[in-house]
Regions:
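Short, aromatic-enriched amphipathic alpha-helices that serve as compact interaction elements
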Residues: 1-14
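Hydrophobic pocket/interface hotspot
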Residues: 7, 19-20, 40, 44, ...
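Second-shell loop/turn segments in exported
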Residues: 8-9, 33-35
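A mature extracytoplasmic/lumenal domain signature
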Residues: 23, 35, 78-79, 93, ...
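Short, surface-exposed beta-strand-loop junctions and turns on beta-sheet-rich folds
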Residues: 38, 81-82, 110-111
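Short beta-strand edge/turn micro-motifs at domain boundaries
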Residues: 88-117
Length: 118
């Protein structure tokens, strides 16, 4: 999904205006982050505007995009950051196609300790 790749580029570049456009402009849009629970596009935009642009580079792993029909998709990925050794990030997004293009309607981001190899 091209929109997911474009979102990722905007995220690591801290392109706040683009990130704001990627989230559905609705009071029902939700983003559960590592340390914040954001309800509505306005809260998500305020979080993005205040966030430090440092340390956003990351490497994606095991990205899976599953579509349901032509207008709904789930994007799930793992990520790692050089600034957080021993940690594994997880991100899941619900995408909906609107008249303006694909938008994130709900997102969840969490970070866990790196699983030990067995």
């Amino acid at each position: 999904m091209a929109a997911f790749a474009a979102y990722e580029r905007a995220l690591v570049a801290n392109d706040v205006a683009a990130l704001d456009r990627f989230f559905l402009a609705s009071p029902t849009t939700i983003r559960y982050g590592v340390a914040e629970n954001l309800y509505g596009h306005a809260e998500i935009a305020a979080f993005r505007a205040a966030r430090s642009p440092q340390g956003l580079a990351r490497t994606l792993e095991r990205t899976v995009i599953t579509t349901f029909g032509r207008d709904f998709a789930i994007a799930a990925t793992l990520f790692r950051r050089a600034t957080a050794p021993g940690k594994l990030g997880r991100q899941m997004q619900s995408w909906v196609r609107t008249a303006d293009g694909w938008r994130v309607a709900a997102a969840h981001v969490s970070i866990v300790e790196e699983p030990r190899a067995t």
